[in-house]
């Protein structure tokens, strides 16, 4: 019976595999015309993107903006995935610079990243404890061990971490070699966390109770803390800066937020995700940095409404945390994002016709990078023509560290923007009262900005 089954499968595979006859048909799709040979030679020697540059769109770019928030200076995340942290701190430092009346201030990314990695380690280990009764091949447990932690993140991480641990100037806890190049150390930390996770599951299976597991977790976190100190340094509990002594929390409350302000409560994450119904609130499980913090919660809006809210914020000189699929159709040399920058279809003799909804559903596009939205250029009707963001790839990238994007590109590849509630119309604030639709951690929209 087994042999018959295998025989049946082999026949089915033979009918659907690439047979010699099918291969011969496929080979006929390339005829080797002089034009095809020339194109093949050019692509193989120069590369796709250089060959696909659309010369009809390669002229001078308009760099003028009708509304632009004063910049705070370009930072550089180097070889790390911390764009979310640089972006969030860039927004906060703009406020601090105004209150301190200074043009020279950078907030320490290394300080908050230390606690980010510590909190994410606890998030993973506690997740292992919470799911210890589930089989190790269950979807949730498998996801946990696949994603023990990363250096990427979202706005909620900035909000939770800054609120809990405060912020400090960068010269108090400067960058290290490891913070500028996180991949190797993160790999070692992930391996150690997986080892700790397996130990927790084995101890649970052997009869260890909740209280003892929590004690073991704290012991494991002690090892994590020591590893983090070796890589990033010791976070100060008090520091002296320009003649005054602060705790990180005191500095944060004094200069980065207004009295009574809450970075979670007072801000709304807006999303344009056409793969899901609009005017609903969504929450992604485990999309947070702190176990007792906030999941990523967003209201899904049509792009037209989202743009109106973003414009209102910029008109009031308020920058925003913004994220997008930055790599699509971006000319990195000039810092210009335009869907007409490259003509890949003509080059390769085909078309690329998926819309935004289809790209999300098939994992072809998603939010990959966070930047600070700081400018918009409006036409006579008050509609956006182009946008400008402050990036964190250093001053030598793009337009002296900035990226300009056409509104057409913005609509196709922009995903998230975080705005103060005061810029949202009453209809959007009413939507936020809904019970969120809970999405699993492995949803296509679970993607950290890096």
Regions found by a protein language model. Name each.
Residues 1-17:
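Bacterial Sec-dependent N-terminal signal peptides
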Residues 109-239:
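Papain-like cysteine protease catalytic cores
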Residues 69-81, 143-149, 292-300, 309-310, ...:
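Second-shell loop/turn segments in exported
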Residues 59-62, 66-131:
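Post-signal peptide N-terminal segment of secreted/secretory-pathway proteins
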């Amino acid at each position: 019976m087994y042999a018959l089954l295998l025989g049946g499968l082999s026949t089915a595979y033979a009918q659907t595999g690439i047979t010699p006859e099918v291969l011969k048909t496929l080979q006929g799709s390339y005829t080797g015309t002089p034009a095809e040979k020339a194109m093949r030679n050019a692509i193989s020697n120069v590369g796709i993107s250089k060959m696909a540059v659309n010369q009809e769109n390669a002229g001078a770019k308009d760099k003028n903006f009708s509304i632009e928030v004063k910049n705070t200076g370009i930072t550089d995340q180097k070889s790390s995935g911390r764009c979310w942290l640089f972006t969030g701190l860039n927004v906060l430092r703009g406020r601090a610079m105004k209150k301190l009346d200074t043009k020279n201030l950078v907030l320490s990314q290394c300080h908050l990243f230390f606690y980010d990695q510590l909190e994410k380690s606890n998030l993973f280990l506690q997740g292992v404890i919470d799911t210890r009764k589930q089989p190790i091949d269950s979807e949730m447990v498998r996801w946990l061990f696949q994603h023990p932690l990363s250096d990427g993140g979202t706005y909620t991480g900035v909000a939770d971490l800054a609120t809990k641990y405060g912020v400090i100037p960068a010269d108090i806890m400067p960058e290290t070699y490891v913070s500028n190049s996180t991949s190797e150390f993160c790999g070692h930390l992930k391996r150690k966390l997986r080892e700790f996770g397996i130990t927790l599951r084995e101890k649970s299976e052997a009869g260890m109770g909740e209280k003892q597991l929590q004690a073991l977790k704290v012991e494991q976190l002690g090892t994590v803390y020591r590893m983090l100190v070796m890589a990033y340094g010791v976070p100060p509990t008090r520091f002296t800066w320009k003649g005054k002594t602060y705790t990180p929390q005191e500095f944060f409350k004094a200069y980065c937020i207004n009295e009574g302000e809450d970075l979670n409560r007072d801000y709304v994450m807006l999303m344009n995700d056409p793969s899901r119904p609009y005017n609903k609130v969504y929450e992604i499980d485990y999309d947070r940095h702190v176990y007792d913090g906030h999941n990523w919660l967003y209201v899904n809006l049509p792009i037209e409404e989202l743009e109106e809210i973003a414009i209102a914020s910029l008109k009031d000189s308020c920058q925003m945390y913004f994220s997008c699929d930055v790599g699509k159709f971006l000319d990195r040399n000039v810092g210009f994002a335009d869907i007409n920058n490259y003509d890949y279809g003509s080059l390769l003799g085909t078309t690329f016709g998926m819309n935004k909804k289809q790209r999300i559903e098939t994992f072809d596009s998603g939010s990959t990078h966070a930047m600070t939205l700081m400018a918009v250029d409006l036409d006579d009707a008050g509609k956006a023509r182009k946008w400008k963001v402050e990036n964190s790839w250093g001053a030598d990238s793009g337009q002296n560290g900035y990226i300009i994007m056409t509104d057409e590109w913005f609509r196709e590849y922009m995903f998230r923007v975080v705005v103060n509630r005061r810029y949202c119309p009453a209809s959007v604030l009413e939507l936020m009262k809904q019970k969120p639709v809970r999405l699993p951690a492995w949803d296509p929209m679970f993607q950290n900005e890096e």
